Amino acid sequence: MKLRTVAASLLLMLSATTVRASAADVGAPVPIYTEAELIKLIEQNKHLQRVRADNCQLVEDIVARATRINLPAYEFLYGDMLAWGVCVEQDVELGLYYMENAAQQGLPAALEQIGRYYSRGTLVQQDKERAIPYLREAASMGNLNARIHLAELLLRDYGSPLDYEDAYRWLYNSVTADQRQHKRIAVLRRGLEQRMPQNIVARAKRRDMFW
């Protein structure tokens, strides 16, 4: 009887140890990102890195929020995952579809990225004119990268001179602690100033309350 009791105790101890080891191997459950947290990751271009760092544990949650609830930040994340084959089977066309959905819902990061893709010919055929509306919309919503990229394209004679005033005003009212971006903005502003009448430059500086 004693031998049976000892054997049973040993089996229980071994089972508990195995469970603890398995839990340690898997790691603690990863909480789903809040929309605010995800948007910040996207703005820092760290969203795919974060998904990889979380060992792809949140794929089902991400897919559900993108395809069933249609949350724009999650549509963008899922689209980017598909486009680059991160934690899911690569499907560039479907990835761009979800990124476009996020852009249509007004997510600035999605608008900026699609505009950048068209401008540089990433995943899609290069079309700088097609990039302009995406970048312009993102710039109007405060996306700094879009503001810089839009001004660069305008100074290379893409888009319309009618956009100079808005592009200048957005740069003039942009705030950044990044010294390289700060200098780049100053260079782009000077370039636009050379193409604009002084009264339009003055008006762009005054209308800082209109976005």
Curated annotation (Swiss-Prot):
Give the membrane topology, semicolon-separated if more than one: Peripheral membrane protein
Which keywords does this Swiss-Prot/TrEMBL entry list?
Bacterial flagellum biogenesis, Cell inner membrane, Cell membrane, Ion channel, Ion transport, Membrane, Repeat, Sodium, Sodium channel, Sodium transport, Transport
The answer, when asked if Glycoprotein is one of the entry's keywords, is no
One cellular-component annotation, GO: plasma membrane
Q: Where found, per UniProt?
A: Cell inner membrane
- List, in alphabetical order, the GO biological process terms annotated in this UniProt record: bacterial-type flagellum organization
Q: Which cysteine pairs are joined by S-S bonds?
A: none
User: Which Pfam families does the record associate with it?
Assistant: Sel1
Q: Tell me one GO molecular function of this protein.
A: sodium channel activity
Q: Which superkingdom is the protein from?
A: Bacteria
- Annotated Sel1-like repeats reside at 72-107, 108-143, 144-179
Q: What does this protein do?
A: The power to drive the polar flagellar rotary motor of V.parahaemolyticus is derived from the transmembrane potential of sodium ions. Force is generated by the motor on coupling of the movement of ions across the membrane to rotation of the flagellum. MotX interacts with MotY, which is the presumed stationary component of the motor. MotX may form a sodium channel.
> Which NCBIfam families does the UniProt entry name for this protein?
FlgprotMotXVib (NF047621)
Q: What is this protein called?
A: Sodium-type polar flagellar protein MotX
**What is the species listed in this Swiss-Prot or TrEMBL entry?**
Vibrio parahaemolyticus serotype O3:K6 (strain RIMD 2210633)
- Name the gene for this chain: motX
